[in-house]
């Protein structure tokens, strides 16, 4: 079994390439998309069609209702299930989608982040507090380790303000995710900015032809509380249109294109800064490198 990730911005062609290669090279696909996990969000998420989902085994698709919670820890479980299935059945695992944060967490793990709290205490005073309340944590660093002392105090303050009396070390043990993926080959589809904008415009128009507004209308009627997935690019703007905040469909399409391009820019920046060891190239270039990797 070989594992690889195909990343890139929205509208870069990740899904199509993953489907093509997974069908040719005995693969399964793990969706790296925070919207595809939800049922009923089909057009807005550019989810593979029913025929495409039937062509290749998929994981991470249609798991939850739009008002249900999904987080990176749950994604880890889906990844483990997909990997075990691929290993058991002698298949290759293709990971693809636009949620680069999930991929980064698979490779590097995840530690909770907390707001900095000014203690007004010296290192020695904090260390004395740590030693008395959390000797397990204190045993791992010196009294001069300013960074870890501050980190401990930040978490300690968070727990106390939440009415919890558990030790910081116990909290971290339960809430820190260790890396679960290694030796993962990463391929990034890259496009010229103007070409990508044209693709975004074309895809947005196609989504409207497929019934994006009808999908949005049904979702907002079913979930008037507007859960987080309904605030994603595409659905959020459609909601504004349906409420009369956006006056014309032309304006709506232009707004979705603009916000999608902004999302693509953020995705591109994240992928470039977080994944140093990867191959970046055109769709054709990446396809050739992936085939070379799979045959190697």
Give the label of every model feature segment.
Residues 1-296:
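Phosphate/pyrophosphate-binding catalytic cores of soluble transferases and nucleic-acid-acting enzymes
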